[in-house]
């Protein structure tokens, strides 16, 4: 038995993740149009009507843009905490009552042999949370959209086999870039986004003996580059004794191209 997943899209313009077991298939977020979501699923040889439900992280548009359309078209259950439901209801349109499920923060829901654990992050949304998936002794941890990584968060995601980890910006590029200071300050704040270097430092506290893959996610298209993010993370990890390519590898994500479906 295996848990498989793909980062369908990740970046400032839209985010969506897919995972499946032998018995179930789920999305985490649907931050692109319904048409784009169809196309991304086709890239990995899957269809949206194969999906059993959608877990929502928070109400920002780059995570829920296509949520209402996809859920209505395919009659999919949506799982989100109460504050996120209240914050996003006007954005996603009418959802039938029997498709609306409350998934409280810091709880676990089970779907067959798949255990889904929610945990809070630090972001400027109503009640943002991400997820850890446990299946057949394997662990997949998703965590983006957080201004910092607390010890509590580290304890929850520690020793995952696969991480999807925010590596949003290069601080120098952000500071010298075109954004107004108010937006720069928000991104750099404790409720903003994690930089390349801070992401790598957090990784050094959570990488385990069985960690095999780390996906660098939610890269800013204005304040980061794939090559820069990878180099910065590799250098910071190496300075702490973690050598990429020995026991684990780093992988890029893209706002328009899904990563290959792979086993956790």
From Swiss-Prot:
Gene3D superfamilies: Ribonuclease Z/Hydroxyacylglutathione hydrolase-like (3.60.15.10). It comes from the Bacteria. GO terms for molecular function: exonuclease activity; metal ion binding. This is Exodeoxyribonuclease YycJ. Disruption phenotype: More frequent cell division over unsegregated chromosomes. Increases frequency of nucleoid bisection. Induces SOS induction in a subpopulation of cells. Slightly elongated cells. More sensitive to some cephalosporin antibiotics, such as cefotaxime, cefuroxime, and cefmetazole but not to cefoxitin or cefoperazone. Increased sensitivity to moxalactam, a beta-lactam closely related to the cephalosporins, but not to the penicillin-like beta-lactam carbenicillin. Belongs to the metallo-beta-lactamase superfamily. The keyword Nuclease applies. Changing residue 60 to A: Unable to complement the cell division phenotype. InterPro entries: Metallo-B-lactamas (IPR001279), RibonucZ/Hydroxyglut_hydro (IPR036866), WalJ_YycJ_ExoDNase_sf (IPR052533). Binds 2 metal ions per subunit. The endogenous metal is unknown. Keywords: Exonuclease, Hydrolase, Metal-binding, Nuclease. SUPFAM superfamilies: Metallo-hydrolase/oxidoreductase. A divalent metal cation 1 binds at residues 58, 60, 123, 145. Its cofactor is Fe(2+); Zn(2+); Mn(2+). Induction: Expressed during exponential growth. It holds the Pfam family Lactamase_B. It is an enzyme of class 3 (hydrolase). A divalent metal cation 2 binds at residues 62-63, 145. Its EC number is 3.1.11.-.
């Amino acid at each position: 038995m295996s848990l498989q997943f793909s980062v369908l899209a990740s970046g400032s313009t839209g985010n969506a993740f897919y995972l499946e077991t032998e018995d179930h298939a789920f999305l985490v977020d649907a931050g692109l149009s319904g048409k784009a979501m169809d196309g991304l699923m086709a890239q990995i040889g899957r269809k949206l009507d194969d999906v059993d439900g959608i877990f929502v992280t928070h109400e920002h548009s780059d995570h829920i843009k296509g949520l209402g359309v996809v859920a209505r078209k395919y009659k999919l259950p949506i799982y989100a905490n109460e504050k996120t439901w209240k914050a996003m209801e006007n954005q996603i349109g009418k959802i039938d009552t029997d498709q609306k499920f409350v998934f409280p923060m810091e709880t676990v829901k089970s779907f067959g042999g798949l255990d889904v654990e929610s945990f809070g992050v630090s972001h400027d949304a109503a009640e943002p949370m991400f997820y850890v998936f446990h299946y057949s002794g394997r662990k997949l941890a998703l965590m983006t959209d957080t201004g910092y990584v607390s010890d509590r968060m580290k304890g929850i995601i520690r020793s995952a086999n696969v991480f999807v980890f925010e590596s949003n910006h290069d601080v120098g590029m952000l500071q010298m870039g075109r954004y107004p200071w108010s937006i720069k300050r928000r991104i750099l704040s404790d409720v903003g986004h994690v930089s390349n270097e801070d992401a790598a430092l957090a990784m050094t506290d959570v990488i385990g003996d069985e960690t095999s893959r780390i996906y660098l996610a939610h890269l800013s298209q204005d304040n980061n580059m794939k090559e820069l993010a990878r180099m910065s993370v590799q250098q910071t990890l190496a300075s702490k004794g973690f050598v990429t390519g020995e026991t684990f590898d780093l992988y890029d994500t893209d706002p328009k191209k899904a990563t290959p479906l792979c086993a956790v």
